[in-house]
Structures are given as C-alpha cells and as structure tokens.
C-alpha cells in the first residue's frame, strides 16, 4: 500500500506518493558560495493529462548546521525563461536574480528548491502559465524532498516567485491551502490577464512609444518599440504552446 500526502483545493485533490523520488545528481554548471551543495532532483508529478511524468528541480542546502527541529524550505518559482527543454534553469547558469534571493535564503538557513516546471528540461511540452501544473511542480517537489529525507526536515515551507513564478506562487497557495505546513506565498508581478495585455493594453502603449521614437528620429535598431513588440510576439507564442500542451487540437491560427 502506498502512503500519500493529500493536498486539496475546492473540488480538486491530488496526492504526493512516497515513492515520487527518482534520483539526484550534482549541478555543475555554476556555483554559489553560500550553498553547501547544489543538486538536481528528478521526481514524478502528474502532467496536464494526469499521467506520471518526470520533473526536475534545483535543491540548494545551506552551509549552516541543521536546526534541531529540522530544515525549513523556501521554494523559488522562476519567471519566464522560454518553453524548450534547454531553457530549464537546472540546465543553465544560475539566474542573477535567483542568485540574490538564494544567497539571502541560504544565509538565513533555509533549504531552497527551484522547480523547472513540467516539460522544461525533461520530455514533454511545457504548459506555459498552466496554474495547476505549476502548483503541482512545486508541491510534488517539496513533498518529494521532505519524504526522501524525512528525518531532516521540519515540514514548514513557503513559496516565492516573480512574473510566471509569481503566478506559480499564487497557484501554489490555492492548491496548498489545506496543508498546515504551508506557511505562505510571495508573488512578485504575477502573470495575469495576458490576453487583455496582449490584445488591448500593449498595442496602445507600443503605438505611443513608436510615435515618440519616430518624432525623435530614433534609429530602427535602437527603437524600444520594435524590441518590445518582438518580446510581445514571443509571449504570444509561449501561450499558444502552453495551450497546445493540454489541448493538442488547438489551432495556432485561432
């Protein structure tokens, strides 16, 4: 019989099996002076189809002594990095923003977990901005680590993130709201109402910026309006990929 930890919100429930741990390997692409170790943990989580899928997360332990009542965990949920496997934070150099946050957390004695999210760094398509998928990547990552090293952790954990990670933090707070060991979420600039931003807000703002740059005779290669428009198109493509991950019949032309 498999023991599980139940996490639920509203009518949605899912379980984190005790055997969700797959393996752990050293992370060797970058270093952080404040970290005693940086590893890549592979674990099982349900994908958007409800099937078991591998997921990965960076796990950073501090150099300080383990508290008498066990380690506490802070999960860092990253912002938009792209949708291809090679974009996964665990396959890249450490982001500078993440380094700043991780240094402070490690100095304070926290274990830091940074999930890649479903479909990043592993097989499958990344369901960009899928709230439930992001929340599961976080919760399964935390519970897997705590289950694997059961005697070393206090149980208490929280989540913090920015941009896409801000949305992931809010989603985690929804799905973990009945978990008494979950202590809170910090969401910086969470992704929200992107359809309205892309279709209504951004075109007006970019048009005004373009007019200003034209009047100033700004060279094409130096125009922020052009670079911003290209970025906007990229986000649109990411969103399309995210929808396609869950709905393969989605037509990009729609």
Task: Pin down the residues of each PLM region.
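Primarily recognizes the serine-hydrolase "nucleophile elbow" in alpha/beta-hydrolase
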Residues: 143-213
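Accessory cap/linker subdomain of secreted extracellular hydrolases
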Residues: 191-254
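Short, surface-exposed "cap/lid" segments of acyl-processing enzymes
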Residues: 48-56, 60-109
């Amino acid at each position: 019989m498999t023991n599980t930890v139940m996490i639920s919100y509203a009518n949605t429930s899912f379980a984190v099996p005790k055997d969700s741990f797959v393996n752990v390997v050293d992370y060797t692409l970058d270093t952080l002076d404040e970290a005693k170790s940086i590893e890549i943990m592979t674990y099982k989580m349900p994908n958007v189809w409800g099937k078991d899928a591998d997921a990965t997360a960076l796990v950073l332990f501090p150099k300080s002594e383990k508290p008498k009542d066990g380690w506490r965990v802070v999960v860092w949920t990253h912002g938009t990095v792209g949708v291809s496997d090679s974009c996964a934070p665990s396959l890249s150099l450490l982001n500078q923003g993440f380094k700043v946050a991780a240094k402070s957390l490690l100095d304070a004695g926290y274990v830091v977990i940074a999930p890649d999210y479903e479909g990043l760094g592993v097989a499958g398509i990344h369901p960009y901005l899928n709230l439930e998928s992001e929340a599961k990547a976080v919760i399964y990552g935390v519970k897997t680590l705590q289950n694997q090293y059961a005697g070393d952790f206090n149980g208490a954990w929280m989540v913090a993130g920015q941009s896409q990670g801000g949305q992931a933090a809010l989603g985690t707070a929804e799905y973990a709201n009945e978990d008494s060991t979950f202590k809170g979420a910090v969401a910086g600039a969470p992704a929200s109402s992107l359809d309205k931003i892309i279709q209504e807000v951004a075109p007006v703002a970019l048009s005004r910026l373009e007019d200003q740059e034209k009047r100033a005779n700004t060279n094409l290669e130096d125009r922020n309006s052009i670079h911003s428009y290209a970025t906007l198109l990229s986000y649109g493509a990411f969103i399309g990929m995210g929808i396609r991950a869950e709905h393969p019949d989605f037509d990009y032309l729609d």
